């Protein structure tokens, strides 16, 4: 069942908070308080400050969201 009224955005993790919470600065300049989705938590994906993430926001409260995907870093020196 797909959820309605969701807004997707990309941003940069600026701060790691207790209990799996993070502050994310989106590409349009908004600061959002986010938590990790269950799928990321279950697969033990590590999210650190400086990572690019994809965030899902509710249309009713644009200050809180859920991290649904960690984007790969293009600036690796491999």
Swiss-Prot record:
InterPro entries: NA-bd_OB-fold, RNA-binding_domain_S1_IF1, TIF_IF1
Residue stretches making up the S1-like domain: 1-72
Coiled coil (residue ranges): none
Swiss-Prot/TrEMBL keywords: Chloroplast, Initiation factor, Plastid, Protein biosynthesis, RNA-binding, rRNA-binding
Entries under Pfam families matching the protein: eIF-1a
GO molecular function: ribosome binding; rRNA binding; translation initiation factor activity
UniProt entry tagged with the keyword Electron transport: no
Quaternary structure annotation from Swiss-Prot or TrEMBL: Component of the 30S ribosomal translation pre-initiation complex which assembles on the 30S ribosome in the order IF-2 and IF-3, IF-1 and N-formylmethionyl-tRNA(fMet); mRNA recruitment can occur at any time during PIC assembly.
Family: Belongs to the IF-1 family.
HAMAP family assigned: IF_1
Protein name: Translation initiation factor IF-1, chloroplastic
């Amino acid at each position: 069942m797909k959820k309605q009224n969701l807004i997707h955005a990309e941003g940069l993790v600026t701060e790691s908070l207790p209990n799996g919470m993070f502050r994310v600065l989106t590409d349009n300049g908004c600061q959002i308080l986010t938590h990790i989705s269950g799928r990321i938590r279950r697969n033990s994906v590590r999210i650190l400050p400086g990572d690019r993430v994809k965030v899902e926001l509710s249309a009713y409260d644009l200050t809180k969201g859920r991290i649904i995907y960690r984007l790969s870093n293009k600036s690796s020196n491999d």
